[in-house]
Curated annotation (Swiss-Prot):
Cofactor: Zn(2+)
Name this polypeptide is given: Methionine--tRNA ligase
Cross-referenced SUPFAM superfamilies: Anticodon-binding domain of a subclass of class I aminoacyl-tRNA synthetases (SSF47323), Methionyl-tRNA synthetase (MetRS), Zn-domain (SSF57770), Nucleic acid-binding proteins (SSF50249), Nucleotidylyl transferase (SSF52374)
Enzyme Commission designation: 6.1.1.10
Enzyme class: ligase
The organism of origin for this protein: Sodalis glossinidius (strain morsitans)
PANTHER family from the UniProt entry: METHIONINE--TRNA LIGASE, METHIONINE--TRNA LIGASE, CYTOPLASMIC
Residues the entry annotates as binding Zn(2+): 146, 149, 159, 162
'HIGH' region (motif): residue ranges: 15-25
Keyword hit for Iron: no
């Protein structure tokens, strides 16, 4: 390889140890695994770690409900999580737990360094207390209306609607999530991390250009609203680590959870003689450190975590790689509808690599939500993996094995076509490296189309019947096998198990840097089925089992779908009428509330060379308009401008839903560009 080998440490967010892994979790772990596998293929020294987040009140309470010790519950869950990740081919070098000796030592060390450096303060606070359960209530065990946007049923630390952060005591009409009673105020001494002391450092880190633009924009918003001291302690009863020299006080789970990245790596270092902890975590480390996380935990990873590391003299992350949520069939995952799918349920019915491929085909470096459309899932996997890639090997291997004893031709039949495939390595590699996996998949499938077109045009099944054309037949089919090898090498980070089967069939490793040398006069092995089609019945079984599991757990039955009943299909129009509507992909460059209107947002849209101003009545659904900035949507571009009291509206954005808070802005798949027509 020509590039300089790097030392890289990669982590995924730590799954919480009180529940099973589901397909929402798997998006992140698959995204990270694809990136890690590509980096390994290019010769980088990369270590991939994770752990269970094993502390906190939820774990303590669930263990009580089960009648077992928290340690027993988290050990069982850790084994289940590791089994699920292994089933999806997630190639962790180490999977640990935050309830470990290493994590306690590191948490204590970091706390003591922060305290010695003057970044830990203590003061008496008024805290919500559940008089029925005789316990102070953590943030996530108090619910009420958000003090900023007044959205109901929000947790005590942050609002999932507007993104605001606050204290539990700020909630409107708070209730205990443990007992349902109204909590009372009690005083307690707590310890605080002086986050505001790191404001300038954090601003500089944000401006460095390393972070995703959407993350940097959100951090700037937090800076403008002012950083607050962070409560890092909790009162007994609590399952976690005790604060040194403070009996009855425990580290808040979000203090020791990210330290779990460090302790999981330290645990790996103890197992291997060739690794040094300081080489990756020392403040002057030259290694790269990347955290793959979901957008729901950006606040903790972009503010608290870097500041904690800075204040305790450890290195900060090189970057955060943030992704969006997973929806199923265009809606939030639902247990009652069977679309809240556990990893183990999926694996019992479907090949893990089908989901790996589908997620890869949709993922990008942006923080966009990914929709698992089950019909599209079946169609895309069957069309791409089975029909385009595997079928390329199948339709050529038979002739090579039967007519030429498995031996490929001594020359390449179409050197220009082979060069096209090999030269694509740079662009495809750049796409993998920059986490633009959807682009990588598009480029790989475009090559697969070229390969199949070549075979169709050369028609080896016809050549095989013509006397005296044995050499032509061998050359054509060998070319098909050569192109299959290149495709499978490119797909290896996404489909590692299929790549292993392809490697056995081809009798040669699939190495990125070896592609320029074709397999000449090489003997392949007899072809065996490499991949199976997805049948609709398999997907139906996953949904039904998931629905039954939810029912057994006491989840409410799904309400009948009523969208059509509430909004009947409009009268039929002819095609000419529809063709008059010019819909385009648009990038939301800016989103603002409209002073004097409680319904409208002002959107500045980029159509790829021109800007439009649109007023849209979606404010109730998006009370924090900045969450829309940087998002792609669909707009009607040729709608006549409309003069409104607040200005000129130059089009209309497309959304679904009955109105009010139930409005869902439409977004195209990753890969669409501003200005593209929607057909």
């Amino acid at each position: 390889m020509t590039q300089v080998a790097k030392k890289i440490l990669v982590t995924c967010a730590l799954p919480y140890a009180n529940g099973s892994i589901h397909l929402g979790h798997m998006l992140e772990h698959i995204q990270a695994d694809i990136w890690v596998r590509y980096q390994r293929m290019r010769g980088h020294q990369i270590y991939f770690i994770c752990a269970d987040d094993a502390h906190g009140t939820p774990i303590m309470l669930k263990a009580q409900q089960l009648g077992i010790a928290p340690e027993e519950m988290i050990n069982e869950m850790n084994l289940e999580h590791q089994t699920d990740f292994a089933g999806f081919g997630i190639s962790y070098d180490n999977y640990h737990s935050t309830h470990s000796e290493e994590n306690q030592q590191l948490s204590t060390l970091i706390y003591q360094r922060l305290k010695e450096n003057g970044f830990i303060k203590s003061r008496t606070i008024s805290q919500l207390f559940d008089p029925e359960k005789v316990m102070f209530l953590p943030d996530r065990f108090v619910k009420g209306s958000c003090p900023k946007c007044h959205s109901p049923d929000q947790y005590g630390d942050n609002c999932e609607v507007c993104g605001a952060t606050y204290n539990p005591t700020d909630l409107i009409n708070p209730k205990s999530a443990v007992s349902g009673t109204t909590p009372v105020m009690r005083e307690s001494e707590h310890f605080f991390f002086d986050l505001p002391a790191f404001s300038e450092m954090m601003r500089a880190w944000t401006r460095s250009g390393a972070l995703q633009e959407q993350v940097a924009n959100k951090m700037q918003e937090w800076f403008e609203s002012g950083l607050q001291e962070w409560d890092i302690s909790r009162d007994a009863p609590y399952f976690g680590f005790e604060v040194p020299d403070a009996p009855g006080k425990y580290f808040y789970v979000w203090l020791d959870a990210p330290i779990g990245y460090m302790s999981a790596f330290q645990n790996l270092c103890q197992k291997r003689s060739d690794l040094r902890f300081d080489e990756f975590w020392d403040v002057d480390s030259k290694a790269d450190l990347y955290h793959f996380i979901g957008k729901d935990i950006v606040y903790f990873h972009s503010l608290f975590w870097p500041a904690m590391l800075e204040g305790s003299h450890f290195r900060k992350p090189t970057n955060l790689f943030v992704h969006g949520y997973v929806t199923v069939n265009g809606a939030k995952m639902s247990k009652s509808r069977g679309t809240f799918i556990k990893a183990s349920t999926y694996l019992a019915h479907l090949d893990a690599e089908c989901l790996r491929y589908y997620y890869a085909a949709k993922l990008s470096s942006r923080i966009d939500d990914i929709d698992l459309n089950l019909e599209d899932f079946i169609q895309r996997v069957n069309a791409d993996i089975v029909n385009k890639v595997v079928n390329l090997a199948s339709r050529n291997a038979g002739f090579i094995n039967k007519r030429f004893d498995g031996q490929l031709a001594a020359t390449v039949a179409d050197p220009a076509l082979y060069a096209t495939f090999v030269n694509a390595a740079t662009s495809i590699g750049d796409a993998f490296s920059s986490r633009e996996t959807s682009r990588a998949i598009r480029e790989i499938m475009a090559l697969a189309d070229l390969a199949n077109r070549y075979v169709d045009e050369q028609a080896p099944w016809v050549v095989a019947k013509q006397e005296g054309r044995e050499a032509d037949l061998q050359a054509i089919c060998s070319m098909g096998i050569q192109l299959f090898r290149v495709l499978m090498t490119y797909l290896k980070p996404v489909l590692p198990s299929l790549a292993e089967r392809a490697k056995a069939f081809l009798a040669t490793p699939l190495d990125w840097d070896d592609l320029s040398a074709p397999l000449l006069s090489h003997r392949i092995r007899p072809f065996k089925a490499l991949f199976s089609r997805i049948e609709a019945a398999q997907v139906d079984a996953v949904i039904e089992v998931s629905r039954l599991e939810a029912a057994a757990a006491g989840e409410p039955a799904a309400a009948p779908a009523g969208a059509l009943a509430e909004a009947p299909i409009a009268p039929t129009i002819n095609f000419d009428d529809f063709a008059k509507v010019d819909m385009r992909v648009a990038l939301i460059k800016r989103a603002e509330s409209v002073k004097g209107s409680d319904k409208l947002l002002k959107l500045t849209l980029d159509l790829g060379g021109t800007s439009r101003q649109v007023f849209s009545g979606i404010r109730a659904a998006y009370p924090d308009p900045q969450v829309l900035e940087g998002r792609l949507t669909i707009m009607v571009a040729n709608l006549a401008p409309r003069k409104m009291r607040f200005g000129i509206s130059e089009g209309m954005v497309m959304a679904a839903g009955p109105g009010g808070k139930d409005i869902f802005l439409l977004s195209p798949d990753a890969g669409a560009l501003p200005g593209m027509p929607v057909k």
